[in-house]
Amino acid sequence: GLQTGRMLEGIENVLQQVHPDLVITFGDTNSTLAGALTASKLHIRTVHIEAGLRSFNRGMPEEINRVGADQFSDILFAPTEIAMENLQVEGLGSRAHLTGDIMVDTLKDNLGRASERHDTLDMHDLNVGEYYLLTLHRPSNVDNPQTLEDILSQLNTLDYPVLFPLHPRTKKTLNSIDMDDRDNIHITKPM
């Protein structure tokens, strides 16, 4: 709550100085919710990209951020038909537009560049198509050392090596875990 509160204050200061015609928010982070809420309170039209995505798990902070951002936004860009249906059920269908998934577009745009970059694979002696890529940063998975240790222990038993670009949040907890017996997990800097 403190982080979001600070964002609300900071975003409000910026919006009052800049006076934008429109605020665009993206995804499901705390800043997404803070941006949509602040703009709405200041009567600035707001767009939410990736609207309507739902896990239906209110225990996830991201779910609260998604639902809130959609409620506060004037225009909702939904990536999928299912997201459109969710918005319809929530009474937000009149504000929603099916736009496609910009994450998929970004992936397609960068596949060529990604396939050309083998530096990280070479550094860890990994072969294309013969490793798993792990991203792990959700608080429920990484904030508790025992939970993180259990996850890594299971991943260490996989048939291929695991390439693990380390998120800053995960790094804090990982420092308290003994990684000596986890030869199958290759930690690297964020990509």
What is the predicted role of each segment?
Residues 21-22, 72-75, 94-95, 159-162, ...:
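Short active-site oxyanion
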Residues 33-34, 86, 106, 172-174:
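Phosphate- and divalent-cation-binding pockets in alpha/beta enzyme and binding domains
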Residues 25, 48, 77-79, 97-99, ...:
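General beta-strand structural signal in soluble alpha/beta enzymes
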Residues 72-147:
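A nucleotide-sugar donor-handling region in carbohydrate enzymes
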Residues 46-52, 100, 133-136, 165:
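Short beta-strands and strand-loop turn motifs
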Residues 51-55, 101-102, 189-191:
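Short, acidic/turn-prone active-site loops that include or flank metal/cofactor-
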Residues 1, 115-191:
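Donor-nucleotide binding loops and adjacent catalytic segments primarily
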Residues 1-91:
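Active-site and donor-binding regions of nucleotide-sugar-utilizing enzymes
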